[in-house]
Structure formats: C-alpha cells, structure tokens
Amino acid sequence: MDLDQISETLSSVAEEEPLTMFLLDKLYAIREKIKQVPFSIVRLCHVYCMLIKYNASNNNCILGRKLIEEMQQFLCGTRVDGSEDISMDLSELCKLYDYCPLLCSALCRAPCVSVNKLFKIVERETRGQSENPLWHALRKYTVTATKLYDIYTTRCFLEYKGQQFFGEAVIYGAKHERVIRHLVATFYVKREVKETLGLLLDPSSGVFGASLDACFGISFNEDGFLMVKEKALIFEIKFKYKYLRDKEDHFVSELLKNPTEKSFSDFILSHPVPVIEFRERGKIPSSREYLMTYDFQYRPQRKLRTCPTPAILAPHIKQLLCLNETQKSTVIVFDCKSDLCEQKLSVFQKAVFTVNVFVNPKHRYFFQSLLQQYVMTQFYINDHNNPEYIESTEVPSVHIVTAFFRRRTEEERSLHLVIDETEYIEEEIPLALIVTPVAPNPEFTCCVITDICNLWENNICKQTSLQVWAQSAVNQYLAACVRKPKTP
C-alpha cells in the first residue's frame, strides 16, 4: 500500500468517528471513572482508537505500533519491558476500542513521566511530516502554529483540509528546505544537521501542536525519543520564490560582486513588494510582510501601505514592537566555485553582516513562532531534572530564516551542488540568508494560549454540549521564561 492509499484510508477512518463524535460516545463513560479528565488524556485515547480502527482493517501496514503497544500496557495495568514484542492479534484490536474509558482512567492515574513519554512516541511516529500520513491525520484536530494567528484574530476555528495542491512557490520552497537547513547548520549554527522532528503535541493541553522546519540543541535517546537540551534553537524556514532570478540579473550580480548592506538593500528593494517592510520609528506596520525595519536604506519609492491592527492585538502591538526592534538580523551571502572535472559546484560563504531588520509582530509568522517556542518549551520543562531552577536564557528560542536563491546558468545545470560534502542535484544556487531572532513576550504568549484554550473549550461545547477541560501549562511556561530576580 503506497502513501496516498494509506493517507486516504486513515482519513476515512478519522471521518467515520471525528473527535466530536468520539467525545459524545466516550466522555460520559470516561467520567464515570474519572470526574475531571484533562483533554490531553482524551486526545491520546482518540489517537489510540483511530489507530486501532485503521490497523484492524489494514493488517498489511501497521501504523503507530509503538504507541499502541505502550497504551496496551496501561490497559493491562503492568509495565513490561518496552523491547518486548506485544502480540498484535488484529482480530482482537476492535475489542480494545471498547476499553477506552478504562484506558483514560489508567492514564489519569499514571505518573506524568509515563504520559509525557506517549507524546514523545507521537512525535517519533509522525517524523517525515508532510510525507507521513499519520502527521496529516493528527493535525486535523490540532491548533497548529500555522492556524494560531487566524484563530486568535477571527475567533473562529477552521477545519483542517489535509493535503492540498500548491502553487509553484510552495513546491519550490519544499524542494529547497533540505538545502536551507543544511546552510543554516553549516554557516550559522555550525553544528551537525539534525533529523527533522514530527508533530509536537502540547503535552499539557493536547490542543496545540507544532512541526519544526529545523531544530538544534536536541538529541535522541536509545529508543529514538526526543530530548530537548538547554538553549535549543528552532528555525522556521521561508523560501522567497519572488526573488528567484538569473545570475545575470543586475541586482544579483551586484550583490555577488560587492556583498555589502548597500547592495543587499538594493536587491531587496528591486522587487515591487520588498520582503522587508520599512516604517518610520513609532509607526505601526502593515501585516503584509513578516520582516520590517526603521532603516531608511530599505525605504521604497512607492507609497507605504497601511492596514488596521486586529482589535484583540491592538493593545499589545507597541510592546511587541519594542521587544523585537532591538533584535538584529544576520545576513549571509553565498557564492559557489565550479569544478568541471568533478562536476561539482561548491558553496562557500562570501560575506556576513548584521542588519537592523526584525520580525513584524502583526504578521502570522510571528504567532507561528510563538506557538513553536511554547510547545518546545513544554518538552524542555518535562525533560529538565529541576524545572523550578530553569533560567529564562535556557529555554528554546526561535529564528526565522529567509532564503534567497538564484537560478542555475546553462553551464551549471549538469553540476552537483555541494554543501559540506553533501551533494544536491536539482536544487537552485543559494544566494543569501537572513536569520532573524524572534523576541516573544512570555506574558503575551500565555494570554494567547489561555484565550485559545477557552475558545476551543467553548467551540467543543457548542458542537457537543459537553464541558471539556483543555488544561494549559502557562504557569510553568511563564516561570521558566521570565527572568528571575537576583538573590542577595
């Protein structure tokens, strides 16, 4: 069975019993055993039941085996060695579905470390992201980073549409993501490229989820489970297709010939809608572009566009601007050396400099970064031996990477692109990166998380007339992220 068939079958299983139907069917029975059940536990049980139903009818392709095995051990009430192969009698799998209330009860009584392990299994089982059918299925009932801005500003929940057809810009971005990740690792972080992670479901609420483009400062234990270390770095990658040009383009050639901030700003302004939005200090930006500056080098000739700030964001926007305007971006300009004998194009760093460019807090990408940092911080807190002693400088941080490429020349089309001994065959040539740190306000992040948890609970109540408890970890997050006063 190929990936498309698996995705289609899994999607049909999810549609047979959506989350709302699952709640209506099971929550009353669950509450007979446990009066107040956190939704994070219910969410794990829903995932388990969805996998049980899928695997019962598709025994030639078992999905989520490790998660099923681990949760069956909770049902049995005993903890056996995880390496033991539990028998997967598919004729019995559907019967296990009826034990959902018992499973919820067992999970509620289980130690936090055991429940957190289940969320790590979910992450491991969804690696590959868009190429993993389980990743798509679990995003359906999750407030992901890409949805956060729309939900927060519109107060509405939109149904996840699953896999869709995308334009050339998105296809190009996906095609070059691996190259950009490699560039960040080699020339910015200067660490080994790590495996991409799966879906990080928020262990506290079960409502939020994040999928990271790149992450450093992590490791994997002997079972392949994620371990988040101190000062982990998260990178959100953006490929700027609208700047993809030939090497002979005047602004591209000038940047390669003399890589300075002046030639770089000229390159940025060469597009009718520059990727960096200029505003005079004290002025509120539009929400069109996710990068902004007060530097007059980036001021365009055309009239600046304005747009109103969403009402719910308006009281916070100036403070968020003040936090982020102090950040500086790093620009790395690349070129390549051709070796016709070995048929290679070796990428090298031609210049690096800082610019007064920062993230626009009115843009959806800022909110995307907030949720990524919030969820990743939950995993860090859960992995920490003494969470109460976590310093604000130790928690994960987020950077947005803006990548510019140029098209291959006719002579370069047959050559392999080489970055740190890794070869790429079809990708275009890296031109520059802008690496921009995001400065979140922990209090604002907590406000957004709490607000959306309440919205989500009310939305479920409207659909099912059920009161669901979406527990958040905003207090733990705030304690970790806010700078602690120095002791005398």
Swiss-Prot record:
EC number: 3.1.-.-
Function statement: Plays a role in processing non linear or branched viral DNA intermediates in order to promote the production of mature packaged unit-length linear progeny viral DNA molecules. Exhibits endonuclease and exonuclease activities and accepts both double-stranded and single-stranded DNA as substrate. Exonuclease digestion of DNA is in the 5'-> 3' direction and the products are 5'-monophosphate nucleosides. Additionally, forms a recombinase with the major DNA-binding protein, which displays strand exchange activity.
Family the entry assigns: Belongs to the herpesviridae alkaline nuclease family.
Class of enzymatic activity (EC top level): hydrolase
Keywords, in A-Z order: Endonuclease, Exonuclease, Host cytoplasm, Host nucleus, Host-virus interaction, Hydrolase, Nuclease
Record GO terms (molecular function): DNA binding; endonuclease activity; exonuclease activity
Subunit text: Interacts with major DNA-binding protein; this interaction increases the nuclease processivity of the alkaline exonuclease.
Pfam families (UniProt xref): Viral_alk_exo
Protein name: Alkaline nuclease
Site-annotated residues for Required for function: 177, 213, 236, 238
Organism: Human herpesvirus 6A (strain Uganda-1102) (HHV-6 variant A)
Primary location recorded for the protein, binned into one broad class: host cell
Subcellular location: Host nucleus; Host cytoplasm
GO CC field: host cell cytoplasm; host cell nucleus
Originating gene: U70
